Amino acid sequence: SLILAIYPLLQSEFSLTFMQIGMITLTFQLASSLLQPVVGYWTDKYPMPWSLPIGMCFTLSGLVLLALAGSFGAVLLAAALVGTGSSVFHPESSRVARMASGGRHGLAQSIFQVGGNFGSSLGPLLAAVIIAPYGKGNVAWFVLAALLAIVVLAQISRWYSAQHRMNKGKPKATIINPLPRNKVVLAVSILLILIFSKYFYMASISSYY
């Protein structure tokens, strides 16, 4: 949300066209969306507790580059780094939310989602106060928040590692799916189409309006 919020500044500084603004959104979305299932698939097989602070390090790198960017190419790379941070962070963070739920998986996931939505809504407000009056160089102030997040996530990763070691020797529960495979595929396909259409409109509106 922070990158979207400073599109007017980027457009003014680099004289961006609508196509170039769309390319920034595309770069971020590709890095944050398409890479995420790959990371999730890998961490299902090989859990990576330290991917939480590692993901935030990618985000921090993207913010630093965005603050210092002197060209459109650097802005694209910054967007890719921030998106990669999201991809690396979210699969394992969802697992941590489930592990910490105490069996109340729905509540834990809801709180996790609310936290993300709150951050997304807060980003533009902070950008209006901290960045808009002074220029995109002030994006560097958000690096402090990223550094604090890395410290907190490192502690969570230690807890996650300890929990993983404790559960490593326990037999995994057998999951029985009573639904036919074709019905599962159909339901997931419909869900993907709905999500795609939702974010298609959201990205279009937020990028240009």
Segments the model singles out, each with a brief description of its role:
Residues 29-37, 120-121:
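Residue-level signature of mid-helix packing/kink "hotspots" within the transmembrane helices
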Residues 155-179:
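Flexible cytoplasmic inter-helical loops of multi-pass small-molecule transporters
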Residues 3-4, 186-209:
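Extracytoplasmic gate region of multi-pass secondary transporters
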Residues 34-72:
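Conserved MFS/SLC helix-loop-helix module at the cytosolic interface between two early adjacent transmembrane helices
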